């Protein structure tokens, strides 16, 4: 029996760590990488070079065209190390019978924060108050400013502006503290850039193209209530196409400049009711969205003495995640091995912690 072949789009550190686990599991990893000497290309024998939006390159990594020897032939499944994929291409492959995991439909919720918020609302999950800015009645800069001010009048300052797509590691997120700051500097440029895009005078990528708007074409913004959180948590789980779910202990994350700097697992001092709620939120998201592979749900926790802990969903990731790196040495099964198991619909590994506390520094 030949080894299963997992095709993965992306050549960064996450795909590299998938390769290490694939070798141990007897799985062949075929990675579409951005550079042959990049993080994944250095350690993966089968690593054709190409872009995630190059249809010919993506099809080749799925079919195995150009791959010789026992590793040739079509992949058992196509997966990813990042969410920034061509949805239309993935849907075409899916319609042709390719197993795409997570599915393009689920992946949309990780790529598009507005779609995610709508799904959360429909599922009744706890999240910050939010609104779309740049709708049909909000074409001009002043109309968008008025809409943000009206949102803040209801939910309070500060508010958080986000680009629906393209943001990562702190990019595409802006804290706005007052009505005055909304008309100054970066916030004003964000809003003006979106207004220009809606008027057909640009693509909304921000000042100078790209920049803090995250590098993606932006024709609307997401405004959210700023949650005065005590700490940030992450619930990490994996789900197979057949519906098996395995959840790791809830972890605490420490963010610096929008990036995960430290993780403590299990989250120290988190009460059992909050742990149960966090796990239920993760399971509900996975079931509601039909997630396959690893899912990370980032949460804000508001802890007040004598009151139940309140949790709010911040963002999602449908892939191995920085908050789960601790599982490599701190859990029976790492997130990278589990992701491979999950997308292949194999039995999931145990997720118990192997130490009282694991600390990961990113």
Protein language model regions, located:
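Protein kinase-like catalytic core scaffold
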Residues: 246, 295, 310-315
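Short, flexible active-site loops
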Residues: 258-268, 315-328
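Active-site nucleotide/adenylate-binding loops and adjacent lid/helix of ATP-dependent enzymes
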Residues: 65-69, 107-234, 238-285
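Short beta-strand micro-motifs enriched in acidic
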Residues: 238-240, 300-304
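Short, solvent-exposed loop/turn segments that connect beta-strands within catalytic domains
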Residues: 243-244, 304-310
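ATP-binding N-terminal substructure of ATP-dependent carboxylate-amine bond-forming enzymes
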Residues: 1-118, 122, 134-146, 209-210
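Active-site "cap" helix and flanking loop/linker of ATP-utilizing ligase/carboxylase catalytic domains
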Residues: 276-297, 317-362
